[in-house]
Curated annotation (Swiss-Prot):
Residues spanning the membrane: none
Single GO biological process annotation from the record: coumarin biosynthetic process
Protein name: Naringenin,2-oxoglutarate 3-dioxygenase
Entry keyword set: Dioxygenase, Flavonoid biosynthesis, Iron, Metal-binding, Oxidoreductase, Vitamin C
InterPro entries reported in the protein's UniProt record: DIOX_N (IPR026992), IPNS-like_FE2OG_OXY (IPR044861), IPNS-like_sf (IPR027443), Oxoglu/Fe-dep_dioxygenase_dom (IPR005123), Plant_2OG-oxidoreductases (IPR050295)
Gene that encodes it: AN3
EC code(s) of this entry: 1.14.11.9
Reaction equation(s) it catalyzes: a (2S)-flavan-4-one + 2-oxoglutarate + O2 = a (2R,3R)-dihydroflavonol + succinate + CO2
């Protein structure tokens, strides 16, 4: 099948087979089902986190343990209004159900800041992810370009503003906890971001004809400081803490946020807090919606451990800007993809040569028989 980037993925969801541009190498394919849920990821109630009593200390201990263990946990009783969450998800579902031409009015290909895109993948990578997304660059607020925010369904812009504000508050609250755990002033991690940047990414994973051959979102760690993910009840978020040998599917919890740390948070803590290694799988039964809110440092923010514990060395050779850290991460990912492609081509050439040699060593009578 020729490689075709569809106008939208929703059209491909009805096909019987998957287009080759979405088929991943065997070692990258899902190993665990989208609905084979694990309870290994802790669910932490934030009720009482603002009381400067024993309750706060208890919650902080749980968060710190989760960050040291997995780099990912879920929070409930987080103070984000259920009505805002409900409106945000309802509007998002309505947007993805719009006809392709309505969604493509906000097409963000070609480097536009925000909008709609089909099957994002890194430039230079061959395999595409099975998802459609809407991206909002929401902080700093002065940099917002509302012409890139979908105006349908009506009312979504106002709800997204409110949602992004509430999630920024929650993210800062969680970073305060981690700063204290590192023995630093409360605002240390937030200050290290200089002028915190926020990106809201709404992911829509349509049902997929051959989900065992592809991923909704390839395996990765987030580059930024902290990510908050709202997911529906379908399931598909997976995490690994042994470099991909074993995977678990995170149990969806109604109204909860899945919190994970990114590379920036990992470096600031000198590796004490894990940057969660994760991916999204898809299924053939139903579509899935998730909303990821990324809090990142400003491009010029300096990345270096804020505290190095006694007897430890820095996990970084030198302080670098976040922009440079991100550039190096992208270059490394592209180089790995290139090497993998090269190895595949060499293996194919070796197999062809072996077949040819086998054929040449046979008597002509045997070949013609």
């Amino acid at each position: 099948i020729p490689r075709v980037t569809p106008s939208t993925l929703t059209a491909l969801a009805e096909e019987k087979t998957l287009q080759t541009s979405f088929i991943r190498d065997e070692d990258e394919r899902p190993k665990v089902a989208y609905n084979q849920f694990s309870n290994e990821i802790p669910i932490i109630s934030l009720e009482g986190i603002d009381d400067e009593t024993g309750k706060r200390a208890e919650i902080c201990d749980k968060i710190v343990k989760a960050c040291e263990d997995w780099g990912v946990f879920q929070v409930v009783d987080h103070g984000v209004d259920a009505e805002v969450i409900s409106q945000m998800t309802t509007f998002a579902k309505e947007f993805f159900a719009l006809p392709p031409e309505e969604k493509l009015r906000f097409d963000m290909s070609g480097g536009k800041k925000g909008g709609f895109i089909v099957s994002s993948h890194l430039q230079g990578e061959v395999v595409q992810d099975w998802r459609e997304i809407v991206t909002y660059f929401s902080y700093p607020t002065r940099a917002r370009d509302y012409s890139r925010w979908p105006d349908k369904p009506e009312g979504w812009i106002a709800v997204t503003q409110k949602y992004s504000e509430k999630l920024m508050e929650l993210a800062c609250k969680l970073l305060d906890v981690l700063s204290e755990a590192m023995g630093l002033e409360k605002e240390a991690l937030t200050k290290a971001c200089v002028d915190m940047d926020q990106k809201v990414v709404v992911n829509f994973y349509p049902k997929c004809p051959e989900p065992d051959l592809t991923l909704g979102l390839k395996r990765h760690t987030d580059p930024g400081t902290i990510t908050l993910l709202l997911q529906d009840q379908v399931g598909g978020l997976q995490a690994t803490k042994d470099n991909g040998k074993t995977w678990i599917t995170v149990q969806p919890v109604e109204g909860a946020f899945v919190v994970n740390l990114g590379d920036h948070g990992h470096f600031l803590s000198n590796g004490r807090f894990k940057n969660a290694d994760h991916q999204a799988v898809v299924n053939s039964n139903s579509s899935r919606l998730s909303i990821a809110t990324f809090q990142n440092p400003a491009p010029e923010a300096i990345v270096y451990p804020l505290k190095i514990r006694e007897g430890e060395k820095s996990i970084m050779d030198e302080p670098i800007t976040f922009a440079e850290m991100y550039r190096r991460k992208m270059s490394k990912d592209l180089e790995l993809a290139r090497l993998k492609k090269q190895a595949k081509e060499q293996q194919l050439q070796a197999e062809v040569a072996a077949e040819k040699a086998k054929l040449e060593s046979k008597p002509i009578e045997e070949i013609l028989a």
